[in-house]
Amino acid sequence: MRCGALRLRNFKNITTETILWGEGLNLLVGKNGAGKTNCLEALHLLLGWGPLGDRKDIASWGSAEKKTYVTGDFFGEEEAFLAVGIGGSTVVKYNGKRCSFPEVRSVAPSLAFLPSDMELLDGSPARRRSFLDRLCALLWPLYARRLVEFRRAVRHRIVLLRQGGNLVALSKAMAPLASWLWGARASAVAALSEGLAALPDLLPLPVQLTHVRGGAGRVKDPLEDWWESLDARREKERLCCSPLVGPHRDDLDVRCGDRSAASCLSRGQKR
């Protein structure tokens, strides 16, 4: 699926109403402040990933109009017209019908690499989890919903831990969610590793990617691992009043041989 035309109305500092895209590689050229990144942000928004920065900063700067519109024509397996309007609320449409961002991501899959993505190697595990979440949301439309459900359960677990409540029922409810998310992330990492292996010239050095289960990794089966790891960390979890096992603590281990990629790659190689 490729974008043939992108139309913008009242979007930041961009005055061009229609931007046409050709097949293959497209380059945006212009002076600093011309709106190159803003143009990419409009695509990022339209394709279901939200703004790159503050949502309140999207409307044209200095304009009295508070509503912003972005639409696009897409071609590939099918023809699709996507539209998003942002103001007091956000409305997303696919071929004229209201839809959700996960639906948009399944219609026109996309992945953006930004300067901040260097934190994929140097940053915290939360940054790498975010990358995995974006990748998995592209592969499985149901992923985002399952992730929201699990995060809600984690918040509930924190409350129960602080209150000294019974965790049995909640642990049972979280088990299939944790198992499913772990399985999805592991499959995504395996697919990414396979793709990188097929393109050896893409990277400066061979890298090995490993999905690391948060607070777990005792047994291979994700469901069994959930229960064994939960049992092993039960007392510590009670003491610190924080959930210690689950996808919310996952990481992506990136290595070059026996060394961390963050420590052995130069800044240029990391890019």
Language model features by range: what are they?
Residues 1-31, 63, 168-176, 180-271:
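Conserved NTPase motor "head" modules and their coupling/switch loops across ABC/AAA+ ATPases, GTPases
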Residues 10, 42, 114-116:
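A secondary-structure boundary/capping signal
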Residues 22-58, 128, 266-271:
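Phosphate-binding glycine-rich loops of NTP-binding sites
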